[in-house]
Amino acid sequence: MMTHPGKKLNFMGNELAEYKEWDEKKALGWVLLKYPQHDSFHKYFSDLNHMILSHPALYQYDYYPEGFEWLVVDDNQQSVFAYARYAPDGEVLICIMNFVGNTHEGYKIPVPVAGTYKEIINTDTDCYTGSHFINKRAIKSKKVPAVHKENSIAVNIAPFSAMVFELKRN
């Protein structure tokens, strides 16, 4: 939910995927980084923070309705959610989350603006110890209605994953 509007809280140890609850009497478990699962999560958390700082759509309109729009909110069969984040300069990001263990190929996501969408982060990337079921190429929107929008993109969504797409205008 780091892409959802509002300020972010990273409490001590979150970035390491600590097993133990924080204890003010003990240091963080930096030794965990020698294990691939923890090291890859640390890399993901670093990449996620870099993405947030690099994209004004993820922070400039945090408390204004102009900065957020639900795109998929009621797909209770597939448990996929999607929303758009906007910046004053016209930047558009599409955030997609899959909360179940099903793979979705060609899942239609409504988009607010016609154009080409490039995946900029995906939790299923192999460098984060995922299965690498990602969207390797930019995806051009099609005039295929989905939910309440005239245009949509067809994306591949891995189980229990989250991804963000950036609009590259045509």
Tell where the protein language model's regions lie, with residue ranges.
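Carbohydrate-interacting/catalytic domains
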Residues: 2-10, 14-170
